[in-house]
């Protein structure tokens, strides 16, 4: 699609969002066509809700998030097919695989194991593997990434290439508030089982999160070697485990309860990360 065409779509979506109270299931014409085109761009990987610049900073295409939100107003509740044993759901968002045959799957180039669920407007890159998992609308899953069993990729989340989301991992979705950025896992990261990264936090390239690490915007991420504390972002090539920090002394003079934090136990370079097993990295 030409740049001028995308700019026209953006303008239409922005205007419609400003007047969203008037958008409903009866809305036709330019607004519906623009929203559908935006969802198609997301679904095909032609555009992303956010992309990383050469300087490492992420730019969020807020108008695409607005298109996703407008689609909830445009689409009525309906039967959604594609469940195990011909089960159906009652929702406003169709399955990404609705109407797909072997031709579409072969062209897409990823593996979709039975009971994985992907909603329309999520993009799955070639080489990715989806175990029984859930990928929400507007999300992006990069090449050769594994989304393991019961992992969830939230709305508009951005998952890089060669990432492993272990069993039960939760990557939070961010549609609103509008100014908030999506949760991002950059290339070559490993997220350990049952870990959660939410609220638009970023895990930078090559990082390893051990099992059961929880990171939100208010979580202290403490570098054990330097004492530096980060919020909302794990630095590149960090090895992170769950930990605690001493709490404040209570009014009665007794030590307060320790509070949860994430601990950077070491940092490695790209060469070491590529040659060292995950278990070895996590051992102290």
Curated annotation (Swiss-Prot):
Which annotated residues bind substrate? Answer: 111, 148
Q: What is its EC number?
A: 2.3.1.117
Q: What GO MF terms are annotated?
A: 2,3,4,5-tetrahydropyridine-2,6-dicarboxylate N-succinyltransferase activity
Q: Supply the CDD domains for this chain.
A: LbH_THP_succinylT (cd03350)
Q: Which Gene3D superfamilies would you find in this protein's record?
A: Hexapeptide repeat proteins, Tetrahydrodipicolinate-N-succinyltransferase, N-terminal domain
Q: Does the keyword Transmembrane helix apply?
A: no
Question: Where are the bilayer-spanning segments?
Answer: none
Taxonomic superkingdom:
Bacteria
Q: Which UniProt keywords apply?
A: Acyltransferase, Amino-acid biosynthesis, Cytoplasm, Diaminopimelate biosynthesis, Lysine biosynthesis, Repeat, Transferase
Name of the molecule in the record: 2,3,4,5-tetrahydropyridine-2,6-dicarboxylate N-succinyltransferase
Gene that encodes the chain: dapD
């Amino acid at each position: 699609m030409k740049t001028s065409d995308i700019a026209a779509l953006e303008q239409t979506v922005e205007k419609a969002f400003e007047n969203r109270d008037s958008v409903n299931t009866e809305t036709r014409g330019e607004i519906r066509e623009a929203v559908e085109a935006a969802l198609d761009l997301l679904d095909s990987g032609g555009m992303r809700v956010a992309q990383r610049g050469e300087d490492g900073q992420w730019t969020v295409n807020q108008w695409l998030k607005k298109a996703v939100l407008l689609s909830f107003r445009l689409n009525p509740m309906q039967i959604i097919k594609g469940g195990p044993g011909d089960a159906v759901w009652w929702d406003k968002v169709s399955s990404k695989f609705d109407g797909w045959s072997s031709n579409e799957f072969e062209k897409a180039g990823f593996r979709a194991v039975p009971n994985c669920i992907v909603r329309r407007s999520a993009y799955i890159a070639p080489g990715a593997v989806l175990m029984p998992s859930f990928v929400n609308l507007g999300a992006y899953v990069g090449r050769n990434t594994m989304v393991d069993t019961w992992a969830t990729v939230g709305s508009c989340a951005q998952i890089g290439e060669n990432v492993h989301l272990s069993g039960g991992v939760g990557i939070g979705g961010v549609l609103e508030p509008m100014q908030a950025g999506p949760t991002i896992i950059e290339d070559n990261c490993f997220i350990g089982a049952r870990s959660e990264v939410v609220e638009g936090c970023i895990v930078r390239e090559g990082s390893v999160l051990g099992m059961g690490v929880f990171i939100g915007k208010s979580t202290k991420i403490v570098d054990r070697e330097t004492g530096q504390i980060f919020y909302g972002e794990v630095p590149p090539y960090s090895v992170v485990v769950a930990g605690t920090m001493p709490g404040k002394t209570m009014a009665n003079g007794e030590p307060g309860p320790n509070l949860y934090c994430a601990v950077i136990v070491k940092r490695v370079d790209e060469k070491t990360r590529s040659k060292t097993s995950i278990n070895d990295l996590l051992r102290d």
